[in-house]
């Protein structure tokens, strides 16, 4: 993983008024802290932070926070906030990391391929959206994926089957299911009796299509047809 450089200026003032002045100047307040680092109040460019969040590793990127006084901190994004209406970044937290010490992070997880069981009518259930792992900061993968093509009805994929890069260890138990192909649920009596969306309720005649001839007086209504499952 490449380390991303992010410039910052030291921030002396705090509070809503100071934060508003920062934002008007094109900056947002941020704070950097760690186990061996006292909280450092800084200001950063929201555009620069968006570039970090939009990179391959996103929130898991390793950042070199260069403060104007010559101090440089190796950090990762711990959290960030958006304005509820404008959806613009308004604040960020950074946590200090050391390149020779492992970190615990959540990695985006995805399934690829169409399972055999889905072809025959089953449903793929992906249990996790992210996978917790432990590794050195520069070893953090951008994503984890599994090929589920061979999964049949009732088959599951366990955490023990994950193929992770060297030096990366999942924090899930080996027998933890991360994806499974379930048989389709059978509709109960009430669900079968319930009309489909857009269908006329029982006893109600459907409106004729535009231009269709009206049924002859006294003619029997057409028999209902069940939807094919």
From Swiss-Prot:
Biased composition (Low complexity): 195-222
GO cellular component, as recorded: cytosolic large ribosomal subunit
Pfam families for this protein: Ribosomal_L25p (PF01386), Ribosomal_TL5_C (PF14693)
Residues annotated as transmembrane: none
Keyword line: Ribonucleoprotein, Ribosomal protein, RNA-binding, rRNA-binding
Chain intervals for the UniProt region annotation (Disordered): 1-21, 182-229
Cited SUPFAM superfamilies: Ribosomal protein L25-like
Disulphide-bonded residues: none
CDD domains: Ribosomal_L25_TL5_CTC
Family recorded in the similarity comment: Belongs to the bacterial ribosomal protein bL25 family. CTC subfamily.
Subunit and partners: Part of the 50S ribosomal subunit; part of the 5S rRNA/L5/L18/L25 subcomplex. Contacts the 5S rRNA. Binds to the 5S rRNA independently of L5 and L18.
HAMAP family documented for this protein: Ribosomal_bL25_CTC (MF_01334)
Name the UniProt record assigns to this protein: Large ribosomal subunit protein bL25
